[in-house]
Amino acid sequence: MSGKWRLVLTGIGNPEPQYAGTRHNVGLYMLELLRKRLGLQGRTYSPVPNTGGKVHYIEDEHCTILRSDGQYMNLSGEQVCKVWARYAKYQARHVVIHDELSVACGKVQLRAPSTSIRGHNGLRSLLKCSGGRVPFAKLAIGIGREPGSRSRDPASVSRWVLGALTPQELQTLLTQSEPAAWRALTQYIS
């Protein structure tokens, strides 16, 4: 990439610390792992002005990391899109990191901006609030469905995604998902 460009990585999840360590917050967990790869682990998040403390950021010359962790994921679009508007002057590449039921734990998919949101309510909120004017790629971090269940019953799905990650799932995210996410991200921005 040349010229005045910026990578904007946005991790979405539910309010922390209440939902920290849940499958639904795997986007925020992966954001932290990628932050280390980007060499930004020593920097402190700052609240983004005019978001009521619901979005925090770290940035350097070419990268901005946004954490939407102060409100429910399904409502994240309103505050995140206010922040995204600040990057309109750049050739910004937006990537949203989120949990994905339809992808097995340990697997990662980077999907182009024009692809489906697959019924993900956090992505739906971002799409709605941006009015489709901010194209964003989707970095789907697989959490899979509950073992032995193919249910799409909202109560079952909610129980699963709001459940705590097991030690085995955390290990899989660290050893399989994070390297795969890093490879996908570096290919996307090169």
Swiss-Prot record:
Main localization, broad class: mitochondrion
Domain of life: Eukaryota
This protein's UniProt keywords: Hydrolase, Mitochondrion, RNA-binding, tRNA-binding
Pfam family, one: Pept_tRNA_hydro
Gene null: resulting phenotype: Not essential, it can be deleted.
EC number: 3.1.1.29
Annotated catalysed reactions: an N-acyl-L-alpha-aminoacyl-tRNA + H2O = an N-acyl-L-amino acid + a tRNA + H(+)
InterPro entries membership: Pept_tRNA_hydro, Pept_tRNA_hydro_CS, Pept_tRNA_hydro_sf
More about this protein: Present with 339 molecules/cell in log phase SD medium.
Protein name, as recorded: Peptidyl-tRNA hydrolase
Annotated organism of origin: Saccharomyces cerevisiae (strain ATCC 204508 / S288c)
